[in-house]
UniProtKB/Swiss-Prot annotation:
Entry keyword Cell wall biogenesis/degradation: no
EC nos: 2.1.1.174
Reactions it catalyzes: guanosine(1835) in 23S rRNA + S-adenosyl-L-methionine = N(2)-methylguanosine(1835) in 23S rRNA + S-adenosyl-L-homocysteine + H(+)
Gene: rlmG
GO cellular component: cytoplasm
Family statement: Belongs to the methyltransferase superfamily. RlmG family.
GO molecular function: 23S rRNA (guanine(1835)-N(2))-methyltransferase activity; nucleic acid binding
Keywords: Cytoplasm, Methyltransferase, rRNA processing, S-adenosyl-L-methionine, Transferase
Family annotation (Gene3D superfamilies): Vaccinia Virus protein VP39
Task of the protein: Specifically methylates the guanine in position 1835 (m2G1835) of 23S rRNA.
Subcellular location: Cytoplasm
Superkingdom per UniProt: Bacteria
UniProt name for this protein: Ribosomal RNA large subunit methyltransferase G
Length: 378
């Protein structure tokens, strides 16, 4: 846990999933402090919109203003709810919207934590363009190293005149005034052909490897299991290309597409609808934190390309949580397949959780591993 003192309230904040006590990662950063400083002793007219509030630092601090927390991460929503409870703040003080929803009209203040990808930032700025006014105070923040010329140009292009502040604690702010500059329409998704198939893959703004098949997924697809039955999971599904291939290779199976990103799940659904509509009755789509809340002993197999970062931080906490949830939800003799960078040494992590692990395939960068849920372990 970490403590954030600001002009609104003193907060105790924790990351979600929680990090270990040996190398704890902080649940807020200097950019959060810097943004809140801009609103000290300031009357806030109209709705407050907060975008990409990773662990709820801004939402908790501004809870008395009934803010809207907008983002593309269910884990961030869970983190914010947990930190509201931790600080004795009514959860209903914050209204949660995902990035595909319509934003509230005529906000008084918009606070943006600049996301990792320009594509998501552009989608969010275009959504804001429909609701902000020239009186809306628009402030964005990030580590100074993460604000580039391209970031500023995007604010200018979509919203209007943009300036930056001096760096403070290695953070920098962007101030923007809306003046409705001319702007061409843009498609909601990017599409590309998947080589070796007749499929066209559609990706919303925040989907990993948005403009083509990433090399880890490409390697994984060469070693996917075939002729499985029952329910199998594409965990952390992204655009659903793994799950789509599983539907094709396992005609007797149902595939459950799971991701914490609403845009990823929307992309997966769109890709099944457009490429294998006949398989929709064998498909389920779920926005979730790994397999939290899913009944145990449900699935015959789980397939996963786990992330090794959360927001801007390198961490295996999300992957570790995925592995534990996968084991709980697998049937006895159910199988977990993963692809990962070789240097992450997930072989020993899986062996610790499952009691076994087998290398299915390897190259100079990636490894495909399989672990089986055995009846003798609980």
């Amino acid at each position: 846990m970490s403590h954030l003192d600001n002009g609104f309230r003193s907060l105790t904040l924790q990351r979600f999933p929680a990090t270990d006590d040996v190398n704890p990662l902080q649940a807020w950063e200097a950019a959060d402090e810097y943004l809140l400083q801009q609103l000290d002793d300031t009357e806030i007219p109209g709705p407050v919109l907060i975008l990409n509030d990773a662990f709820g630092a801004l939402s908790c601090a501004l809870a008395e203003h009934k803010p809207y927390s907008i983002g593309d991460s269910y884990i961030s929503e869970l983190a914010t709810r947990e930190n509201l409870r931790l600080n004795g703040i009514d959860e209903s003080s914050v209204k949660f919207l995902d990035s595909t929803a319509d934003y509230p009209q005529q906000p008084g203040v918009v606070l943006i934590k600049v996301p990792k990808t320009l594509a998501l930032l552009e989608q969010q700025l275009r959504a804001l363009r429909k609701v902000v006014t020239s009186d809306t105070r628009i402030i964005a923040g990030a580590k100074a190293r993460d604000i580039h010329t391209s970031t500023l140009e995007l604010f200018e292009k979509v919203l209007g005149p943009t300036t930056t502040t001096l760096a403070w604690k290695k953070a920098r702010l962007i101030n923007c005034t809306f003046n409705e500059p001319p702007l061409a329409d843009a498609p909601q998704t990017v599409s590309w052909k998947l080589e070796g198939t007749d499929w066209t893959i559609h990706n919303h703004a925040n989907v990993f490897s948005r403009t083509g098949l990433d090399i880890g997924a490409r390697f994984f697809m060469q070693h996917l299991p075939e002729n499985l039955e029952g329910e199998i999971v594409d965990l952390g599904c992204g655009n659903g290309v793994i799950g789509l291939t599983l539907l094709d290779k396992n005609p007797q199976a149902k595939v459950v597409f799971v991701d914490e990103s609403p845009m990823a799940v929307a992309s997966s659904r769109l890709n099944v609808e457009t490429n294998m509509p006949e398989a929709l009755d064998r498909s389920e789509f779920m926005i979730n934190n790994a397999l939290s809340g899913v009944e145990p002993f449900r699935f015959n197999a789980v397939l996963c390309n786990p992330p090794f970062h959360q927001q801007h931080a390198l961490t295996d906490n999300v992957a570790w949580e995925m592995f534990h949830y996968a084991r709980r939800c697998l049937k006895i003799n159910g199988e977990l397949y993963i692809v990962a960078n070789r240097h992450l040494d997930y072989f020993h992590k899986l062996k610790k959780i499952f009691g076994n692990c087998t290398t299915i395939a390897t190259n100079n960068k990636f490894v495909v591993l399989k672990a089986v849920k055995l009846g003798r372990r609980r």
